[in-house]
Amino acid sequence: LFFDTDFEAHASEIYDDPKWPKAPLFYASFTSLTDPTVAPEGKESGFFLIPLAPDLEDSETLREKYFDMILARLEKHTKQSIKTFISFKESYCLNDFKEDYNSYKGNAYGLANTLLQTAFLRPKIMSKKVKNLYFTGQLTVPGPGVPPSLISGKIAAELISQNTSKQVLT
């Protein structure tokens, strides 16, 4: 996690005045350092994540600008040239979440990216407001990741079987 810029300013640019952040905080992960199977021999694999407000303009120009910005900061912190070694690059952003997942406003974090929708405060599997409405996936309990998403589907199926006369395959 790179918290080398103003956290309050970035948070304000997500929640109070939604826009692409001037100096974004970001997360960097180079999984090939601990799992060599995720990159070709002699290469590394990594990704960056920048928290953004939903429903912002999304273009290749903006994506490239922000990639260059955070890569320059990473190079500054590591005192290493990285960009010249990149042989493949791909971006995934708001428009991709809308197109691939029909995600409301391109939001990658669920109904809202707020404290009240994280950890144990996530929406429960069974709706409190709508009878016989069940939620599954990483944005509900038990949480993010493939195993918890599959578990939430199994729990929802079991709840549907218990609460209705329908038998659901699990």
Q: What role is predicted for each listed range?
A:
Residues 23, 27, 80-142:
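A glycine-rich dinucleotide-binding beta-alpha-beta segment and adjacent secondary-structure elements
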Residues 40-73:
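Conserved FAD/dinucleotide-binding core of flavoprotein oxidoreductases
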Residues 1-39:
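Mid-domain catalytic core of redox enzymes
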Residues 138-160:
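A conserved FAD-binding loop/helix module that cradles the flavin
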Residues 6-9, 31-35, 53-55, 116, ...:
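Short, glycine-/Ser/Thr-/acidic-enriched flexible segments
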Residues 36-43, 124-129:
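Short glycine/proline-enriched loop/turn "hinge" motifs that connect secondary-structure elements
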Residues 161-170:
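Active-site-proximal substrate-binding core of FAD-dependent oxidoreductases
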Residues 48, 74, 133, 137, ...:
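Hydrophobic, well-ordered secondary-structure elements that form the walls
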